[in-house]
C-alpha cells in the first residue's frame, strides 16, 4: 500500500489520556465551535495542545454538543475558536501548497492511536480493510479491534 504522505506530513497526533483508564479529565479546558464547511456543518473542539474532536452536525447542534461532552467527562467546556480549530477547518479545503500542520490531541488507548496513525497512511481516494490495517500493525487477528477503533475515531472528518 502506497503511503499517504500528505496526511502524515500535515497531521500530527499526541495522546490526550488513556481512554481505558481516564474517566475524568479534571483541569482540562476544551474550546469548541460550530462551522460550515463544503461537506456540511461541523463541531470542532480543541485543547491548548491540538484538536481533540471534530464531527458533523447531523441531529442538531444540541445533540452534537452533548455527544462531544460525553467523550470528555469532567472537563471545562468553553465556546470559542483557536488556531488549532482554524487549521483543522482550513485543511478540509486547502491544497497541499497552502496546508498547515494540524496538531491533534486525542483521547484514546495506545491501540486506538496506533490505528488512527495507520489510517493517515492510506492514500487519498483509496481504501483499506480492517484486516489490512491489522496486518500493517503486526497484529493480523485484531481486525475486529481495528474496526472498533475506527468507529471510535473522534476526528473522522480529518482522519477518515
Predicted regions located by residue number:
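Short glycine/serine-rich loop segments
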Residues: 141-160
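Basic nucleic-acid-binding alpha-helical/helix-turn surface characteristic of O6-alkylguanine DNA
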Residues: 1-141
Amino acid at each position: 500500500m502506497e503511503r499517504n504522505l500528505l496526511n502524515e506530513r500535515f497531521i500530527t497526533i499526541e495522546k490526550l489520556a488513556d481512554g481505558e483508564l481516564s474517566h475524568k479529565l479534571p483541569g482540562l479546558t476544551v474550546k469548541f465551535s460550530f462551522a460550515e464547511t463544503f461537506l456540511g456543518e461541523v463541531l470542532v473542539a480543541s485543547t491548548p495542545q491540538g484538536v481533540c474532536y471534530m464531527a458533523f452536525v447531523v441531529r442538531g447542534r444540541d445533540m452534537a454538543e452533548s455527544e462531544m461532552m460525553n467523550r470528555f467527562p469532567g472537563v471545562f467546556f468553553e465556546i470559542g475558536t483557536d488556531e488549532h480549530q482554524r487549521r483543522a477547518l482550513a485543511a478540509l479545503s486547502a491544497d497541499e501548497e497552502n496546508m498547515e500542520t494540524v496538531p491533534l490531541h486525542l483521547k484514546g488507548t495506545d491501540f486506538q492511536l496506533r490505528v488512527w496513525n495507520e489510517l493517515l497512511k492510506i492514500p487519498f481516494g483509496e481504501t483499506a480493510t480492517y484486516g489490512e490495517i491489522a496486518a500493517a500493525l503486526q497484529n493480523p487477528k485484531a481486525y475486529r479491534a481495528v474496526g472498533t477503533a475506527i468507529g471510535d475515531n473522534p476526528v473522522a472528518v480529518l482522519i477518515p
